[in-house]
Amino acid sequence: KKIYTLFSALCLAAAAPGTLSAQNNFKLVEESVSNPDNTPAPVYPVPSERQLKWNETEFYAFFHYGMNTYTNEEWGSGMERETVFAPTQKPDPRQWLEVAKKAHMKGGIAVVKHHDGFCLWPTATTEHCTRNSSGYGKNVDIPKEFADAAREFKMKYGFYISPWDMSSPYWGKKDSNGKYTDEYAKKVFLPQCVELAKYGNDQFEMWFDGATGGDHDGGYGSYTSSQKRTIDNAQTYYDIPNLRDSIHNLLPNVIMWGVGGEARWIGNED
C-alpha cells in the first residue's frame, strides 16, 4: 500500500501576490508505508502450523474401552490376567464414531492402552494384549477398526497411549547403582508408539498421559504381588526428544499431547 502526501512549497523569495502557481505551491510525493494494516508483531512463543491445524478440531471425543471395562475399575494394576478381557461380540468403533459424528464432533481419540498396560492391539512388545485374551478378544484390533471408521466418516482420529505401564517389569526399573534403566523406553514405549503410527499417517493426535506412578500399586510383571514404583523425570525417562522426532518422521501432522508434547493441560486441572 502507498500513501500520497502534499507538501506546501515554502517560498522564501519575495514575490508579488498571485505570481506563484498552485503547481509550485504543492508537490505530490509517493511513499511506501511499512505495515499499513498495523499488524502487531508476534508475541513469542507463537503456535506452529501443526498446532494451529490441531486447534481447528475444536470438538472431539475420548473413547474409554479396555481391560477396565471388564474389571469395573477406573484404574487397573497391570496384574489382570489377559483372559479377563473377554468380549462376547466384536467391539464396534464404527458405532462409537457414528454417535460422535451425530453430535457434530470432528473426530475422536481411542484409549488403546491405559495405565494397566493392556494393549488393545496385537502388539509385539508385550504379552499383555488382545492376542492372549479370550472370547472374541483374540480378534480385537481397536486401532485398525477405529482408523478405518474415522476415514469412512471423514473424521479426525488419534490414539491415547499411557507412558506409565503397571504391567511392564521394565517400567521404573533401576540398575545396581540405583539409576533408572532405558529398557522400558527402548523395548516397550517407543516401539508401541511406532506400531500405532503405522495404523495411518493421517492421524491428528497421539495422546500421552502425565501419570508417573507414585502411590498406586502395580504388578510390574507379576500377577500375584504388587509394589509401588515411580520415576523422577518423564522427559528424560521416556527419551522425549527422540520420541518426538521419531513419531514426526512417521506422522508429520500429528500433535503429541501431554508428556513432552506440543499440547497440554491448560493449567487448571487437579
Which stretches of residues belong to each language-model region?
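Bacterial Sec-dependent N-terminal signal peptides
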Residues: 1-25
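Mature catalytic domains of secreted/periplasmic carbohydrate-active enzymes
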Residues: 23-270
